[in-house]
Amino acid sequence: MKYAECHSVADIVREVFDLVQWDRSRSHGGRVAYYFRGENANHEGGDDVPRDLLTPGIYRGDSLLKFEPEIFNEALRVFPEEFVRDRTTFEILTRMQHYGYPTRLLDVTSKLMTAMGMVRSQGNRGDETRKRRNGFIHVFRVNADRIKYGTSDTVTALSNLARIKSDHVTIEDLQYLTAECKNERAGFFWEKGSQTTDALERDVQKVWCVRPMVNNIRVNFQAGEFFLFGCHDLKKPLQATFAESEYDDSRSPTEGIARIGILTVTPRAKEEMDDFVECLDIGDERLYPDFAHHSEMLRERFGNVR
């Protein structure tokens, strides 16, 4: 994995271009795609270094995972009108993710500019102190075989883990998923010992890149895609390293997905993004298209005009 420190927008673009060109020059076998994840700071508190492990929100905190079904059901109970258009559990998780709920999704994007916007943005929480801290852009190579659509059996099964208590989850007996999944995919099939079921048992213990339905305004504006995390027995978290050394390892949860580089984006580069925010089209009102962020943008734009 390569590291670089970026002090300007030009540094970021140049480093990503060089990194992807270098990676393409090597043989990986099969088609690949490149994805980016922007973070405005190390959310675990370290100012200067990126996180070694990238984890979804539901893994952050000792008790969140234990109460995953309660979090899921409370969101539906309190804001049913927000989810009325969502036809699958994955679509519900997508909407929850974009509004800051802890889920088993990790945001990534195929567009570098969106990742840069995430580095600059203060997100849903508006923490101004993050402007004075290093941000990070993680660059991933993803084998095309590790990319799924939101309607696949694998994604349906992994998404419905959010509805089920930890002590009910046993990888060798996934029959408990059948009732939930058949509501979304009538052809969902589970039979002990079948080839399809054996494959699903392996798939549930992996991380997958998922392309969502573009029926969510934030997904549309952000070109948002996701890493969807499965689990082991009793919902024990995956050790998702995204290491290049495990890219071809069928035993690894991150088989076919490698983090090939990390760019450290300094506060100086963040300031330059602020100066060119409209030109780059990476303002918060673009990434988070709602009344609150749009009104804040207008306040900043016109509040100090002389």
Give each language-model segment a name.
Residues M1-R306:
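Catalytic-core elements of nucleic-acid end-processing and repair enzymes
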